Design a protein with these regions (language model features):
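S-adenosylmethionine/decaboxylated-SAM
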Residues: 1-168
Length: 168
């Protein structure tokens, strides 16, 4: 629905996985939209490429292989829609580059931000191995809600998502 409302032409996805979201972006974005997607996990990359080929969308989707932090820091083009669906504990580290790349009026959607609702639990209720991820996600949510350049809403459905619009 956001793609239908915003009609983005330059879309950036951080976290390709097998390419499902990128293919959906192709389906719902306006004609001529270009999708750039980033994936690090070597086993997913050939699956995503094959899915793009089978969907006939190879010309519309550019898959960048490697570490998202490194790739984001090297990008110079701005985007009018950015979708974050990568390593959840890294969102906070990606944010400075994502903000640099998101044009004024652009939309940032971050997926899985509530971690099945556990993100609102006490630090001590969260399993020890997940505490760093949850701490970083709380920091990320705080930054989104308090950054004067953004208007952000948290959508508490499933694992949660945020929808942010850059206003400055």
């Amino acid at each position: 629905m956001l793609l239908a409302v915003r009609r983005p032409i330059r879309i950036l996805e951080v976290g390709t996985a097998v390419g499902f979201s990128a293919l959906l972006f192709c389906e719902y974005a306006p004609e001529g939209a270009q999708i750039t997607t980033i994936e690090k996990y070597e086993k997913r990359i050939p699956v995503a490429r094959e899915n793009f080929r089978r969907g006939g969308k190879e010309a519309q989707i550019t898959l960048l292989e490697g570490d998202a932090a490194e790739i984001l820091s090297s990008l110079t083009e701005t985007y009018d829609f950015i979708f974050m669906d990568a390593a959840k504990g890294q969102y906070i580290h990606f944010l400075p580059d994502v903000m640099r790349l998101l044009e004024v009026g652009g939309v940032l959607v971050s997926d899985n931000v509530l971690q099945d609702g556990d993100i609102i639990e006490s630090h001590y209720v969260v399993e020890r191995r997940n505490r760093t991820i949850y701490k970083r996600m709380r920091e990320y949510l705080y930054e989104l809600k308090h950054d004067e350049r953004l208007i952000t809403s948290i959508v508490p459905i499933g694992d949660g998502a945020t929808v942010s619009v850059r206003i400055k």
